[in-house]
Regions:
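Short helix-capping/linker segments at secondary-structure and domain boundaries
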Residues: 44-54, 102-109, 149-151, 199-206
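Short, well-structured alpha-helical segments
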Residues: 52-56, 73, 90-100, 112, ...
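Extended cationic-aromatic binding surfaces that line active-site or macromolecule-binding grooves
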Residues: 30-62
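C-terminal accessory module of base-excision DNA glycosylases/AP lyases that mediates lesion recognition
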Residues: 1-25, 122-124, 137-211
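A structural motif
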Residues: 131-137
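Structural motif
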Residues: 24-36, 46-47, 86-91, 181-189
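Alpha-helical ds-nucleic-acid-binding substructure associated with the helix-hairpin-helix region
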Residues: 61-131
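Short, hydrophobic/amphipathic alpha-helical patches that form generic packing surfaces
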Residues: 36-45, 98, 189-200
Length: 211
């Protein structure tokens, strides 16, 4: 199987984004970008991805920074609990409220204004994202991996986990060379799929198994 064929197979079988798993389609709109940010915050902690995704679905009841700020702390805790995100529910509920305050005060609740302030500089986007409470390095990578679908200046975004997945699949461990294997429109799904190869035991073998 050629590298391009391998890449296509990986996307086809494992290229579901976290956003899609959480039940929303990412677009360059304030609500969807905010939901991606919340999802990235939830994935920043040492917790199973499926639990974070489940909690993000429940928090979809508060799809904007304003709605999140208007929700009571207990409403946030309850939503996290329904998603089984119970280990960090209280601290995360507080962080989400503080994060909503930050986004509303600094960007009017619109992450596109953060993008504009960064002026197309990926490093600056990541610096500004670091200001969001509880959004750690892992969460920032997740946000950028997925947001590259709608923010072209992030492309190609293949972080260390994605590159590790590429190496496991026998593909180049280089972002530029990986980008040559698929269309730019597929970078986000390709990156998500490569990360999944590092997390799900036996997935690569299933993908490479003869039909």
């Amino acid at each position: 199987m050629s590298e391009q064929a391998t890449a296509r197979a990986i996307i086809r079988e494992a290229g579901t984004s976290y956003a899609a798993q959480a039940g929303f389609t990412l677009t360059d709109k304030p609500s969807q970008l905010y939901r991606l940010l919340v999802l990235s915050v939830l994935l920043s902690t040492r917790i199973k991805a499926e639990i974070a995704v489940s909690a993000a679905r429940e928090l979809g009841a508060f799809p904007t920074a304003r709605r999140m700020r208007e929700a009571t702390w207990q409403q946030r805790v309850d939503a996290l609990g329904r998603g089984s995100y119970v280990r960090y529910d209280e601290s995360t509920a507080t962080a989400l409220g503080n994060g909503a305050d930050l986004l509303l005060d600094k960007y009017g609740g619109d992450l596109r204004k953060l993008r504009k302030e960064a002026g197309g500089d990926v490093r600056r986007i990541k610096e500004l994202l670091r200001e969001v409470p509880n959004l750690g390095p892992v969460g920032i990578d997740i946000f950028c991996r997925e947001a590259q679908a709608v923010w072209p200046e992030l492309r190609p975004y293949f972080d260390k986990k994605a590159l590790s997945g590429a190496e496991k699949a026998g593909l180049p461990k280089d972002a530029g060379r990986l980008a040559e294997l698929v269309d730019a429109a597929d970078y986000a799904r390709f990156s998500a799929a490569l990360v999944r190869l590092t997390l799900e035991k036996g997935l690569l073998e299933e993908i490479k198994a003869p039909a």
